[in-house]
Amino acid sequence: MGTEVQIREATHGDLDRVVELYDAICDYLDATFNYPGWTRGEYPARWTAEQALANGELYVCADGKALLGTCILNGVQPEGYRDIPWQEGISPAEVLVVHTLAVHPSHLREGVSGHLLRFAEQYAQGHGKRSIRLDVYERNVPGVRLYVCLQQKCDGKTC
């Protein structure tokens, strides 16, 4: 990817493009191998983006021409996180969770996920977060591999 990318908080003007990206990646996963178990129109879907947008948690990665990827950043930890032996001494308020990291199929293997995760690290530092937790399904082999390659520590069955 030779073009400069920008990551920013999404606006209402981005909503349709985010939903199109969700639909495109779900179609791609259905045609290949659906590691994350996403279903078009169910998750991720318009409601996912609308809720995150309303909460100021939806972020987009764009290159000036196209929406390349998106993610949701917040402190909401899924139910299963309670059973994982996380690093001691970190309160829930000091945790940032990356949810619904999605890259448009036309831009896979261009480093978009890496850009989004580096942005999440900067965001966490700027907002007093001491830990980043990556919400990824344990059988999502490419997702887990990505996080390991980017030197994220995996605890238990989630990263």
Regions from the language model: what does each represent?
Residues 26-48:
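Conserved GNAT-fold acetyl-CoA-binding loop/helix
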Residues 72-100, 108:
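Conserved acyl-donor/pantetheine-binding loop and adjacent beta-alpha core of acyl/acetyltransferases
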Residues 55-71:
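Conserved beta-hairpin
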Residues 103, 109-122, 145-149:
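Conserved acetyl-CoA-binding loop-helix of GNAT-fold acetyltransferases
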Residues 108, 134-144:
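Conserved beta-strand-loop-alpha-helix junction that forms the acyl-donor binding cleft
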Residues 76, 135-136, 148-159:
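Conserved catalytic-core motifs of GNAT/GCN5-like acyltransferases
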Residues 117, 124-135:
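Conserved GNAT acetyl-CoA-binding A-motif
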Residues 6-20:
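A short beta-loop-alpha structural element at the N-terminal edge
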